[in-house]
Amino acid sequence: MKIKGLVDEDFVNFKLPCMFISIGTCNWKCCIEANIPVTVCQNSDLAKQKDIDTPIDEIFNRYISNPISEAIVIGGLEPMMQFEDVYNLIKYFRSKGVNDTFVIYTGYYPNEIQDKIEKLKTFKNIICKFGRYVPNQEKHFDDVLEVNLVSDNQYGEVIS
């Protein structure tokens, strides 16, 4: 799986302590639609980092070896651009009997990725954070993720 980084214990992206996986691909839709430079994106520096090829079983073993993390968050750049990797990661965890929550931070809206959402519904405990980054908005508390999100159009939704 091509990633940009992995944090074994993250406490800011979900209500539970989680493993955070940074995906390595983006089409910069948020910046393009807002007509702002890509450098404004909080993930622009992440995009410049070298890709790390990480086997799914290695991610799994790191997760289950950590007594603190209770969920997995997959985020920026854009996870839906590596959907097969994301799907296969979740499938691997489920095949090993781990049904902990997966949270996918995407800049897409449900109507743009309905086919992918339908595939994700085949798994238990999936949450998506939907919505593009829009500059100059006030952050707000999301009741599903139980964390602050930076744009008021962004929201968490339980998929399954």
What kind of region is each of these model predictions?
Residues 117-137:
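Short, hydrophobic/π-rich interface segment
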Residues 23, 76, 104-106, 132:
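A cross-domain feature marking catalytic cores of carbohydrate-active enzymes
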Residues 68-96, 130-134, 138-159:
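Conserved glycine-rich "GG(E/T)P / GGGxP" loop and the immediately following alpha-helix
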Residues 4-6, 11-54:
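Canonical Radical SAM [4Fe-4S] cluster-binding loop centered on the CxxxCxxC motif
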Residues 44-61, 80-122:
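Canonical radical SAM enzyme core domain
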Residues 18-20, 71-73, 101-103, 127:
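Structural preference for beta-strand elements that scaffold enzyme active sites
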Residues 37, 68, 98, 123-124:
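Short loop/turn motifs at secondary-structure junctions
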Residues 14-15, 64-68, 121-123:
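Flexible, charged surface loops at secondary-structure boundaries
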